[in-house]
A protein has these predicted regions:
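Glycine-rich loop(s) and the adjacent beta-strand/alpha-helix scaffold that form part
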Residues: 1-55, 59
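FAD-dependent oxidoreductase catalytic-site/capping-region signature
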Residues: 30-35, 47-245, 253-258
Length: 258
């Protein structure tokens, strides 16, 4: 209503309950081997383009994240963290473009699988092409802050292991000067980013739940012949990647509709 749009049906849960995986990177320099940073610089990048075109091999033939790990933290009975590992280091700008670091290195990111923080997505105007106002509210609970710092410490433990120390040089990120929990948390706030797993803004739930948007057949509460079929119907964040469960929702929706 504040944007001059007539309300036909009110569901306060629409746009609320936004959840996402929040990742934090640790990068370490290495003293030997060829990393993606090296492969992305001239003249190797040109050679790698032709290598892929003619042989479908080389660094362009495999994903950036080569290793994934689910692991338990302090007191956990099931995995609470996910790590992605990349044989390259670099920086990402505000547009999502990545530039290689000025030295050979490797990168890992960790995310808390079941965060408590909740955000929202709201419209800004009557213009459907206008970008919405997206507020994730990352690290807005004590639990999320504490567990995210714990995840960063686990990454450092991996890099401190003897096999890696044989090729390690300096820690590029966080940096040796970042040691206390408060310093690590400050780094997380400045350097953390999305894993691109947003869900929950049209959550499934019983009609008695004032924040529920759809029922167990994906039908919008209180409306006829309207369903929502995407990741927004998940009440809680998936403990892993969201693509496969979203495909499963679409397949189920096809069965319900047809």
């Amino acid at each position: 209503e504040k944007h001059g749009i007539e309300v036909k049906h009110e569901l306060p849960g629409v746009g609320e309950n936004l959840q996402d995986h929040f990742m934090v990177a640790v990068q370490h320099g290495v003293n030997r081997g060829v990393t993606l940073g090296c492969d992305g610089q001239f003249p190797r990048v040109v050679l790698n383009v032709f290598k892929y075109l003619f042989t479908k091999r080389g660094p362009l033939a495999f994903p950036a994240a080569n290793v994934g790990v689910f692991f338990k933290g302090e007191g956990d009975t099931r995995p609470s963290f996910q790590i992605h590992f990349t044989p390259g280091a670099g920086d990402m700008d505000e547009h999502g473009n990545t530039a290689p670091a000025d030295q050979p290195g490797v990168n890992s990111t960790t995310c808390l699988l079941r965060p408590e923080s909740r955000g929202h997505v709201h419209i800004r105007s009557t213009d459907p092409k206008s970008p919405p106002a997206i507020q994730y509210n990352y690290l807005s609970t004590e639990y999320d802050r504490r567990r995210t710092v714990e995840g960063v410490k686990w990454q450092r433990k991996i890099y401190a292991a003897k096999p890696f120390q044989e090729i390690a040089t300096t820690e590029i990120k966080l940096g040796a000067h970042v040691q206390t929990d408060e310093q690590i948390l400050d780094y997380c706030r400045k350097e953390g980013s999305s894993v691109y797993h947003p869900i929950g803004t049209c959550k499934m739930g019983a009609a008695s739940d004032p924040m529920a948007v759809v029922d167990n057949e994906l039908r919008v509460h209180g409306l006829h012949a309207l369903r929502v079929v995407d990741a927004s119907i998940f009440p809680y964040l998936i403990s892993g990647n969201t693509h496969a469960p979203t495909v499963a929702v679409a397949e189920k929706a096809a069965d319900l509709i047809l």
